[in-house]
């Protein structure tokens, strides 16, 4: 190889993108009002009682113990969210505790 062939060639230049304003324009046209975002199936829920919150904490603790996960604030939050999502999705569980949190104390 001669020295001119050994020189490294510059990579081809990237093409510049055209103005991305049309995408921004589409985003501005999106519906952003809260009333228009609500689905007809949105339901009002009663606030949690302290008893329900205590039961949720107990279920989350038991879930972490069963899975042998260290009990940290982060893992407790994730366990509680898992339980709430299972109850709201209607996942059937043989545990009476899940039914208690679903129906109240």
UniProtKB/Swiss-Prot annotation:
A family per Pfam: HERV-K_REC
Locus of motif Nuclear export signal: 50-59
Composition skew (Basic residues), residue ranges: 10-19
GO cellular component, one term: cytoplasm
BP GO terms, sorted: mRNA transport
A molecular-function term among this protein's GO annotations: RNA binding
Motif (Nuclear localization signal): 13-20
Domain of life: Eukaryota
Annotated compartments: Cytoplasm; Nucleus, Nucleolus
Record key words, sorted: Cytoplasm, ERV, mRNA transport, Nucleus, RNA-binding, Transport, Transposable element
Function summary: Retroviral replication requires the nuclear export and translation of unspliced, singly-spliced and multiply-spliced derivatives of the initial genomic transcript. Rec interacts with a highly structured RNA element (RcRE) present in the viral 3'LTR and recruits the cellular nuclear export machinery. This permits export to the cytoplasm of unspliced genomic or incompletely spliced subgenomic viral transcripts.
Anything else known: Despite functional similarity, Rec shares almost no sequence homology with HIV-1 Rev and HTLV-1 Rex.
Protein name: Endogenous retrovirus group K member 104 Rec protein
Source organism of the structure: Homo sapiens (Human)
């Amino acid at each position: 190889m001669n020295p001119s062939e050994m020189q490294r060639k510059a990579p081809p230049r990237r093409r510049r993108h055209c103005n991305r304003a049309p995408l921004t324009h589409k985003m501005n046209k999106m519906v952003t009002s809260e009333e228009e975002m609500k689905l007809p199936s949105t339901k009002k829920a009663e606030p949690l009682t302290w008893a329900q919150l205590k039961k949720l904490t107990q279920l989350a603790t038991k879930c972490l113990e069963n899975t042998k996960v260290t009990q940290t604030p982060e893992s407790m939050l994730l366990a509680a969210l898992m339980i709430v999502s299972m109850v709201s999705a209607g996942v059937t569980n043989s545990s009476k505790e899940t039914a208690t949190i679903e129906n109240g104390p």
